[in-house]
Amino acid sequence: LSLSDTFLAVPIAIDRNGLGHGSEGSLKNLNFLRSYEWSGDLKEQRAILAMAHEIYRYGFVEICENDHGKCSSIKIFLSHAKAGDTGRLHAESIYQFIDSTNMSRFFDATEISPGFKFDEEIIKHIKESTLVAIGSDAYSSRYWCQREILCAKQHQRPIIAVDCLHDFEDRVFPAGSNVPCVHVSPDTPISQSDILRILIATILETIRHLHAKKSLEYYQSQNWIDNDCAIISRPPEIRQVIDLKNSGKQKICYPEPSLYSEEAGWLSHLEVDAFTPLWNKAEDGAFSSFRIGISISDNPVGNYSEHHLHADHLKRLSQDLARHLLARAGTVIYGGDLRKDGFTQFILDEAIALKTRLNTDNIHVENHLAWPLYVSDS
């Protein structure tokens, strides 16, 4: 196994003996994840958290040879209301857990250097962090909570909302929407399982956010997206669109999936064209004169570790192919039976969903019955 700048490895020690592999060879001097230290009930969550964090570090951070890991770790900004106990106590528990791992953190005034302005320091940290908004009953009504959300949105930072309402909030802050949300119990102390769920969602959203941005920027560099098009990593929001339009942008590209026409209708009033790479109105009729056949075989029998091909891969491929061919007015031809969870059913489901999404009847699927006929054993 030869490692390089483009082929990296994160070794995992199943037991203490596994650490011995770090004394020589390609794994020499590499730090191992120690799975034997993870408690039994939470082992799966800890594994996901640890591996997702390494994917973030090696995928989106420039790591120097002498980097000890801490400076390339994800930075998390815990945003919470001080009023009431739920938000504050949940934030303290998350803070304590983060402090025991290799994730840098920023936690209210505890990280603000003496002599620095409070608001300037908060904004500075938000600009380089993933914001975790701990939504207690008082959260949406607090001035600084609103400012922290708006600052994160302004600087296109990843955001996770944590729903821990005890009773209710009288008004949900509009800018706090359009982001992933994790629900946890308002009871204190928050469980380690819920902390792990929050942190896993935080890291996965950070990876998604950064990957989407880099992917769209690459598409733009290849002229698949116009150079005068703004790139954003979430579906567009009215405050953001107004700012972009004021800066001269009339076109906006955001990641898949595209918004339903009813949700995106307000964009037409601002005369802004917002689209995803595969859902551009300019290509709506690109395949109107084509009848396109799809032929997909079953995946090899066996487990994932042997063939490195999960059964879901082919299902998703058939869905994606059908979705984008149909969206461009193509007629999809497929030969198959309508067995439960079969590829034909998946393609028909996509056609039905697409009719609703595009609000049109111009969706065509031709299914030619396969021979021999499929007969269920049951």
Predicted features and spans:
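C-terminal interaction surface of TIR/SEFIR-family domains
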Residues: 4-7, 11-100, 165-289
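Conserved beta-strand-loop-alpha-helix hinge of the TIR/SEFIR fold
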Residues: 1-20, 83, 123-170, 249-267, ...
